[in-house]
Amino acid sequence: VEYCAAGSNNGTLERISNVTFANINKNSTATTGYEDFTATVGNVTPGQSYNFSASHTGTTYSSDQVIVWIDYNKDGDFEDAGEQVLITGKKMSPWTGSIAIPVTAPAGQTTMRVRLHDSSTLFSPNATPCGNSGYGQVEDYTLNIGELAVSDVKKNNISIYPNPATDVINVSNVSSKTKFEIYSVGGQLVNQGT
């Protein structure tokens, strides 16, 4: 799926240094008007809410604002009802909020777009998912809704089943000194051991 171009005309001031959402904790150099971080995948579950934070370590202004969109129906745009999922207050860094994933969100991978822009009418604001703003930055991420983005373990004939599981999993073909970690669909560590 190809999305509309977005960015800023001036990437030297208001920029994004970090985005934290679900299991995403992505630092960036914040040097361009657009960064493609779709190789970074966040795992979310329908019906759950997740804290969101974007920040910049440099200069920010009281008119700066972050807006987030998720292409829930995977149609290549962020224009459908409910796809603008967060609009922060106008303030200096950090910009925070909570994003609720609808129970009806289809499972699978889609794109999340994050825009930081200066909302002042003096600096060509752009509160839409497409096009450029005068100042700011846009970053795209991949979200995996409803299932972990992890392929079946094949190395050394290790077998984990059933997948998905609700309360019991079986692991076979491992030595008694094997370390393990189990993560929820939301990316939280729920169990670990040897």
For the regions a protein language model found, what residue spans apply to each?
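A broad "non-catalytic interaction surface" signal
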Residues: 1-147
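C-terminal outer-membrane/trafficking sorting elements
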Residues: 149-194
